[in-house]
Amino acid sequence: KPFGTMAAQSIGAVAEKELDNGTVVVHGVTGLERSLDSLLFGTPGLGGSIQLTNGIRTWAEIEPQRGYDIVTTIDIRIQDILETELRKKCAETKAEWGTAVLMDVETGEIKAISNLRRDNADSTYHEGLNYALMGFEPGSVMKPISMMIALEDKLARFNEKIPTGKSFPYAGGRPISDSHAYNSLTPAEIIEVSSNIGMAKITLRGFEKEPWTFRERLAEIGMFDPMNLGIYGERIPLIPKLGNKNWDRISLSRICYGYSTRIPPIYTLMFYNAFA
């Protein structure tokens, strides 16, 4: 690898494998090396040899063919900056791991992607798992996505004040709360102050009677579409399928602000890139 460990999890790694006939081949096992292995591997050559009086003479019966070259969208200069800044931020916050991805707003191309994990032995950070593609509970970064659906479905007006307060004891579940109490908030203010109560109340306006339709709306805007990045290990978001029980309504009121879900960070980036 000419650039060392930069974007190592996404570019991937290779490993040798010995075939039954003793031939050693090299195949991709992670990242692009694995997902594009059929293009990168090429075709091994076949050779034969004959014992002559003056030694062994070997010739190739079928010449090996090189695999294809591939060109990624990674910009190595941006990659270097991104990885350096992620390492600084991880060290500053003493994070166990961190991921950062930079996407071109106009094209959606990935220009840089970094995944770092802390080595507990010396507290330094090295390339870890491809966290950008793994599902995690996103929390409040889900709210703008839910709000986009709410505004498209006209569940709230831009200048409308939504009563919030500090606690919302909904449907017999654990009360929804905010860290700060506000009497009422507009949709923009709900996003600005990250109000769980405001987001839940707006979402329930449109989906309380049929909770499962919220997931259907997420599907309509591409939440479960494969991104087809070409990187082995891509996952799609996991959001529970809801029914028509009281518990499903409670789950809906949590899902809309990012709880009870597992969404890869790169999907969150995709939606935020669309907002931009």
Cite the ranges covered by each PLM segment:
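Conserved SxxK-family serine transpeptidase/carboxypeptidase catalytic domain
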Residues: K1-Q9, A13, Y68-D69, D225-M227, ...
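Small/polar-residue-rich segments within soluble enzyme cores
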Residues: K1-R66, L269
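Flexible glycine-/small-residue-rich
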Residues: G12-V14, I74, D104
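Beta-lactam-recognizing serine transpeptidase/beta-lactamase-like catalytic domain environment
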Residues: S49-E61, A100-S140, I145-A276
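Conserved, well-ordered alpha-helix/loop/beta-strand core segments that scaffold catalytic motifs
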Residues: G55-G98
